[in-house]
From Swiss-Prot:
Keywords: Acyltransferase, Amino-acid biosynthesis, Transferase. Pathway: Amino-acid biosynthesis; L-cysteine biosynthesis; L-cysteine from L-serine: step 1/2. Belongs to the transferase hexapeptide repeat family. It is an enzyme of class 2 (transferase). This is Probable serine acetyltransferase. It comes from the Eukaryota.
């Protein structure tokens, strides 16, 4: 993950 507010690899990883 690049950023907590960005959907990058895992959309559910936040």
């Amino acid at each position: 993950i690049a950023n907590v507010f960005a959907v990058d690899i895992h959309p559910a990883a936040r």
